[in-house]
Amino acid sequence: MENIVLIKPHERITNTAQTSGMIRQAAVTPELCNNNGLWVGLVSAPPGSSGAHHHGDAESAIYIIRGKIRMYFGDNLETSLEAEAGDFIYVAPNTIHVEENLSSEEPVEFIVARNATSSLVVNVSE
């Protein structure tokens, strides 16, 4: 494993696990960095909502780069919070959630980091 690895935009992995309403691009992965235990990627979401999903036993940290989202979570997605550029969100393992882009015109972008070696997405039937 190299001590420092640079991942350029054109090197990101785009065929990662996906959820409707979201586009995930993997950057820090075993395939690109020969690392173990960490996945980091860029996510963009057009106006609208993602499908319901969770990330298994992985913890997730999200940093909003651009835009504003509402995240729904809870047993019946009854709880929500709003986050905007500059905010961080922590998502505990196995937490079912939905991200909603609050803009009607612009995509939202955020960085996601997980203690996993893949994007680890479990889509949930709605």
Q: Where in the sequence are the language-model features?
A:
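A short, N-terminal "cap"/entry segment at the start of jelly-roll beta-barrel domains
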Residues: 1-37, 123-126
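Ligand-binding loop in jelly-roll beta-barrel domains
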Residues: 84-85, 93-119
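Conserved short histidine dyad/triad with adjacent acidic residue
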Residues: 24-25, 29, 41-56, 93
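Short beta-strand His + acidic residue motifs that chelate non-heme Fe in jelly-roll/DSBH
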Residues: 52-53, 71-72, 80, 91, ...
